[in-house]
Amino acid sequence: VIKAQVLAGGRGKGGGVKIVETLDEAKAFASKLIGSFLITAQTGKKGIQVNKVLVAEAIDIKKKLYLAISIDRSTSKITIISSTEGGTEIEEVSAKTPHKILKEQINPLLGVLNFQARQIALNLGLTGSLATKGSSLIKNLFKIFIENDCSLLEINPLVLTPDDELVVLDIKMDIDDNAIFRQKEL
């Protein structure tokens, strides 16, 4: 899989992601991308220039999920957003099937409580040992969110493989501009 590395979402729909079968296909697509301007719903009409690509191994996917942590502007609270409809733009899911998006507010002083992590995992359709793995992932993501002064940490998609493994295929991380001085290495 060849993925354009730009600071914008919607790369797949914008033509910035392609599954290739051969080395020649990979070279051709990467050459086409590098130096081009990728236009997505988040970039505006001018697009963003692609200077790098990521080459990743393709994996078999059983189910695509969505998981994000953000600051809910209407409540000014940290919120975990989850959906069984991963791999597409969450705005689309919200418009067409809002009942498939679940939100859980988190107290920053307490962090993600065990019952909250478990409930989010269950809402994602994870059961048994997968719910345990999902709960652990959720708690670890929250820790990353707090430690790095994030305003958004979005996994789309989080995939379930046929072997029942959870794999983060794409992640977006936005750092709060007011805290960037604390995050020099980022």
Regions of interest found by a model, annotated:
Residues 177-186:
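Conformationally flexible catalytic loops at phosphate/diphosphate-handling active centers
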Residues 36, 88-90, 175-178:
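A short local loop/turn or secondary-structure capping micro-motif enriched for an aromatic residue
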Residues 105-168, 172-175:
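Glycine-rich, mobile lid/loop segments that gate access to catalytic sites or pores
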